[in-house]
Amino acid sequence: MGQKVNSNGLRFGINKNWISRWTANSHAQTAKWLIEDEKIRNLFFVNYRNAQVSNVEIERTQATVDVFVYAAQPAFLIGSENKNIQKITKQIKQIIGRTTNLDLTINEIGSPMLSARIIARDLANAIEARVPLRTAMRQSLIKVLKAGANGIKVLVSGRLNGAEIARDKMYIEGNMPLSTLRADIDYALEKAQTTYGVIGVKVWINRGMIYTKGLNRTPAHILHPQKKQPNRQNQQPRHFNQGQVLSANKLTGSDVETSSIQALTKPNKEDKQ
C-alpha cells in the first residue's frame, strides 16, 4: 500500500498536519476554496521559484485567511522595504477577494536539503539545463544524505536524454520505509519542461522516525536544523589497519615468530617423496 499511494496523503492526520485547514458551509464553497488554495500555492511555486518554497499551508475562517509559507530563501519573498510582500498580498487578495482579511507569514527553513520539493525542483532545473541525468541524480543523493537524511529515493521518467521511447530511471540510497506510518517521509513531484517533452521528477526523503504524539505544526527539517559537519582538514590521516587488534588468534610477537619458524622447518609431502 505504501508503495502505491502518495506518501504525504497517507500520513496526513497521523504525523503530518493538513496543508489546508478549514470547514466550508456548502459544497459550492468547498469547491471554490479548493480552487483558490491551488491558485495560491501555484503563485509561490511557479512565480517565486528563486525563493525555494518548500510548503504552503492555509487556514481559513469565513472572514479570514492565514497563509504560512516555508522557504529556503525568504529574502526573495520579502524584498527590499517589504515591496514583494505587498505585491504578493495584492495577488492573493485578487484570488480570494479583497473583502477577506489576509495574514501572510513567511518562515525560513533550517535544512533546505531535507525538503523533497526543493530537491525535486533543483533536479528538474538541472534536467532543463541539459546536465547529464546520472550526474544530476547523483548530486541530489549526495546533498540529501550529507544533510542528515536516513534515505532518499529519486524517480525520473520521460524521454530521458532525448530518447525516442520514454523510460524511467530510479536511484535509492539508505532506508525508505514507505509503509511505516511513523516514518517522517516527505514526497514531492515536479516537472521539467524540455524540447523533447515533459519529464517527471519524483523525490522521497526519509527524515527519521516520529515517536511523539500529536501533529507537528512545522516540518521536521525546520524543527531540527542541519548540523554542522566536523572539520577534518587538520586531522592526521588514519591507515586502514591502525588500532586494530587480532583478538581472534591472540598472538603475541614471540608466538608469531615461533609459529612462522615451525612452518618453515616443517617438511612438505613432496620432499618426502
From Swiss-Prot:
Q: In Gene Ontology terms, what is a biological process of this protein?
A: translation
Note down the stretches annotated as region Disordered. 244-273
GO MF terms listed in the record are: mRNA binding; rRNA binding; structural constituent of ribosome
Biased amino acid composition, Polar residues = 244-265
Annotated GO CC locations: cytosolic small ribosomal subunit
Alphabetized PROSITE patterns for the sequence = KH_TYPE_2 (PS50823), RIBOSOMAL_S3 (PS00548)
What InterPro entries does this protein map onto? KH_dom, KH_dom-like_a/b, KH_dom_type_2, KH_sf_prok-type, Ribosomal_S3_C_sf, Ribosomal_uS3_bac-typ, Ribosomal_uS3_C, Ribosomal_uS3_CS
Keyword Nucleotide-binding included in the entry's annotation: no
Protein family according to the UniProt entry: Belongs to the universal ribosomal protein uS3 family.
Instruction: Provide the assembly information.
Output: Part of the 30S ribosomal subunit. Forms a tight complex with proteins S10 and S14.
How is this protein named in the record?
Small ribosomal subunit protein uS3
Please name the source species.
Mycoplasma pneumoniae (strain ATCC 29342 / M129 / Subtype 1) (Mycoplasmoides pneumoniae)
Q: Name the gene for this chain.
A: rpsC
